[in-house]
Amino acid sequence: MRLGSAALDSAIALTVWLQIELAEPWQPWLFDIRSRLGNIMRADAIDEPLAAQSIVGLNEDELHRLSHQPLRYLDHDHLVPEASHGRDAALLNLLRTKVRETETLAAQVFITRSFEVLRPDILQALNRLSSTVYVMMILSVAKHPLTVAQIQQRLGEKP
């Protein structure tokens, strides 16, 4: 079974558009997201395992922690998008929802009726990409957004 390229192609297209629309601070994030989406497409197309890949130096576990505990790590609580969050957050939310749609489609394709997960690597990668874009949204609305180096330092601190 294959996910096919339509959903991934659409997510890549939106990522490329945001690379044009958004300012420099987001470029490394978007470059890595675009790369990850392309690697997912390739792994799906040729049925090979998907290798681990960081986004701006953050691994999948770190991205998961950031998205689930933003107040602890990013100094901003969870958010529900609204117009007052501004243009960057709105554009990033379009990408987040596109990645989530792709993840949902992947779940339909790669989880059998007996609940066997055929491509856990692709499902987890898509889930972490939506987490990544959610983290970007939070950083875009924070009064004093943290740098990646500051985020990495906080992730390394003991609770």
For the regions a language model picked out, list residue spans one by one.
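Phosphate/pyrophosphate-binding loop motifs in nucleotide- or prenyl diphosphate-using proteins
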Residues: 1-159
